[in-house]
Regions:
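Phosphate-group recognition and catalysis centered on beta-loop-alpha active-site segments
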Residues: 1-248
Length: 248
């Protein structure tokens, strides 16, 4: 059901580094994390890049949106200065650059497909096609070296399924709705990814009994982490890579 690591560094390095950057992934690696979660969306010219927010202002200074900005211009923007002076000038990375870094350092990837509004199907398809090209030398049966896709956008996840059916998928839901099983079946999903705050032990048992894995976001308290693992949750991501170790 869940052949992957148990603890993932959220958006690269959690709170210790700017999210969705190579510096963040390096930070997670420095803390011993060989499993990372990050977000991917498309630039104006269709290049998959790491970014959570479709609009600038929080992690990238300025006005505008990722979907309206060329990749070359995104690379010139500061994606690290918001975090601390140490990371000022950190670039918005391409998905390809991060995949290559993760492969070189044996880091497992949970790739959250995060489409800007109106680009759901295109984002799912292009991220999947890009992944296939980057991992052309990896066997489709080699689960440890294939990423795990996930998305809140069912349209994006289905587009990824059609473009790259061999790459495993997880359905993201903020809470476990009545249609969770139908959604996972339609997506051909490996797991359900959900907010630990809206989850209970009975739901975990139901999902696991149906043959699916359970992944939670974003767990930053050790007592809560122990609790959900006792319930049978398979894995979770954390911002507190300084408190919750990779071998928790």
């Amino acid at each position: 059901m869940w052949p992957y690591p148990k603890v993932f560094a959220h958006r690269g390095g959690g709170i210790l580094a700017p999210e969705n950057t190579l510096a963040g992934v390096r930070c997670g690696l420095e803390y011993g994390f060989h499993a990372v979660e990050f977000d991917v969306m498309l630039s104006k010219d269709g290049v998959p890049v790491l970014m959570h927010d479709p609009e600038f202002g929080r992690t990238v200074k300025g006005q505008g949106s990722v979907a309206a900005t060329l990749f070359s211009d995104l690379q010139a923007m500061d994606a690290g200065g918001w975090h601390s002076a140490r990371f000022a000038g950190e670039a918005v990375p391409s998905y390809a650059a991060v995949v290559n870094f993760c492969r070189q350092n044996h880091i497992f990837m949970n790739v959250e497909i995060k489409p800007a509004p109106g680009f759901e199907e295109a984002t799912g398809r292009i991220v999947a096609e890009t992944t296939l090209a980057l991992l052309a030398d990896v066997s489709v049966t080699d689960e440890q070296h294939l990423p795990l896709f996930s998305s809140f956008s069912f349209a994006a996840l289905m587009a990824a399924k059609h473009a790259a059916p061999a790459i495993p998928r997880g359905v993201l839901m903020d809470s476990v709705g009545d249609d969770w099983k139908a959604r996972l079946q339609e997506a051909g999903a490996r797991a359900l990814h959900t907010n630990h705050r809206h989850l209970n032990d009975a739901q975990v048992a139901q999902i696991k009994d149906a043959g699916y894995g359970v992944f939670c976001y974003t767990v930053n308290d050790t007592e809560r982490a122990h609790e959900i693992l006792r319930w049978g949750v398979d894995a979770f991501c954390t911002d507190r890579i300084d408190l919750i170790p990779a071998d928790f």
